[in-house]
Amino acid sequence: MAKEKFERNKPHVNVGTIGHVDHGKTTLTAALTRVCSEVFGSARVDFDKIDSAPEEKARGITINTAHVEYDSNVRHYAHVDCPGHADYVKNMITGAAQMDGAILVCSAADGPMPQTREHILLSRQVGVPYIVVFLNKADMVDDAELLELVEMEVRDLLSTYDFPGDDTPIIIGSALMALNGEDDNELGTTAVKKLVETLDSYIPEPVRAIDKPFLMPIEDVFSISGRGTVVTGRVERGIVKVQEEIEIVGLRPTTKTTCTGVEMFRKLLDEGRAGENCGVLLRGTKRDEVERGQVLAKPGTIKPHTKFEAEVYVLSKEEGGRHTPFFKGYRPQFYFRTTDVTGSCELPEGVEMVMPGDNVKMVVTLIKPIAMEDGLRFAIREGGRTVGAGVVAKIVE
C-alpha cells in the first residue's frame, strides 16, 4: 500500500515524556510510535534511535533531545524525550521544546522518586499546563493494593505542585509489553492506545500564536521624513491591523499610539501577522520616544514588571558558562526578547551559592521594567556572554 502523503489538516499538539531515570520514558516513547503506526498509520521509531538522541543547541546550551511524531485519529503529536535528567532541566527552562502537555512516566514497582518530584515541580515552574500519568511496569506488580498506593502517592505529589491530582488521568500499563506487541490483561497495546485517547481528550487544543493578542518586540526604530516613526521586529503573536490602537510597553511608562501602516519587504500591507518580520508605522510617536527592548502590544494585554520569581539553569563551564559559583547579590544582565537589563538575584533560603551546571529558583529585581508574563524565557548574560537561561515562573510586582 502506498504511503499516504503528510496531511497538515489535523491539529498539532506538542507533548513529551517526563519522570525519573529508568522508569521507562524512552520505552514508552518508542511504544507510542509503534502502537500509533499500527492503529493510526503513522511511522514507527525504534528505541535505540530515540535513546541515542542527537545533541542540539538552544540559546547556546547543549541539550540531547529526541523528537518523534505520531498520529491519533484526530491529532498529530510532536513528542520530545530526553535521555538524561540534566537535559530535561535545560529543555524545560529554555523552552527548547515547549509542551502543551506532559506524560509523566512513573514505575509502578518503585513509585515516585526524586526526579518524579523534580519534573512535576519544573512543569509547574515553566508553565506546562497539563500532565497525564502513565504508571509503567505494571506487569511486575501483582499486588493491586500496591498499585493503588502508588497511584495515590502520584496524585498527592501532583496536588502538592498545584496540578489537579484528584482529576489527573492515570493509565496503568507496561510500555515494554506494548513495544513488543503484547497485551496481557490489556496492559500493553491497549494501555498505550488508551493513553493516546487520553491525550486527545484531556489536553485541550492549543491556541495558535496567530489567535493570541498582538505582541511585537521592537528591534529597531527609524524615522522616515514625511511619514513618521517606524519600528521593526518580528510579530511574536496575533495580528496588527492598520488604524488599530496599540500600546508601547516596557522600559518607560506605557504609552498609546496608532498603527498607521505596516510594511514588509518594502510593500505596504493592511496587517502584520504572527511570524512575520515587518515595520510598523506609529502615528504621532517621536523617534526618541521608543527604543529597542520595548514591545508593541494590543492595549491592556501585557504590563511592565521589575520583580519576578524565576527558574534558572546556570551553564556549566563546558557549555561556555562561568567557571566559578555566584552568590546572593549577583548582578548580571537579563536578556529579554531584544535587550539586556541589569538585575539582582535573591537566592532561596539556605542556598548560599549556585554552581555552574545547577538549576535554581531565584527572585530577580530588574533596574528597569520589562513587558512580561509568566512563561517568558530569558538569558542571563555577563558582558554579552550567555551564562544562564531562565523562565519567569511568577510575577511579583
UniProtKB/Swiss-Prot annotation:
Residues 60-64 are annotated as: G2. Residues 81-84 are annotated as: G3. GTP binds at residues 19-26, 81-85, 136-139. Its EC number is 3.6.5.3. Residues 174-176 are annotated as: G5. Its main location: cytoplasm. The keyword GTP-binding applies. Residues 136-139 are annotated as: G4. It is found in: Cytoplasm. GO terms for molecular function: GTP binding; GTPase activity; guanosine tetraphosphate binding; translation elongation factor activity. It holds the Pfam family GTP_EFTU_D2. One of its GO terms (cellular component) is cytosol. It catalyses: GTP + H2O = GDP + phosphate + H(+). InterPro entries: EF-Tu_GTP-bd, EF-Tu_GTPase, EFTu-like_2, EFTU_2, G_TR_CS, P-loop_NTPase, Small_GTP-bd, T_Tr_GTP-bd_dom. Keywords: Cytoplasm, Elongation factor, GTP-binding, Hydrolase, Magnesium, Metal-binding, Nucleotide-binding, Protein biosynthesis. Residues 10-207 form the tr-type G domain. Residues 19-26 are annotated as: G1. Mg(2+) binds at residue 26. Monomer. Belongs to the TRAFAC class translation factor GTPase superfamily. Classic translation factor GTPase family. EF-Tu/EF-1A subfamily. GTP hydrolase that promotes the GTP-dependent binding of aminoacyl-tRNA to the A-site of ribosomes during protein biosynthesis. NCBIfam families: EF-Tu (TIGR00485), PRK00049.1 (NF000766), PRK12735.1 (NF009372), PRK12736.1 (NF009373), small_GTP (TIGR00231). This is Elongation factor Tu 2.
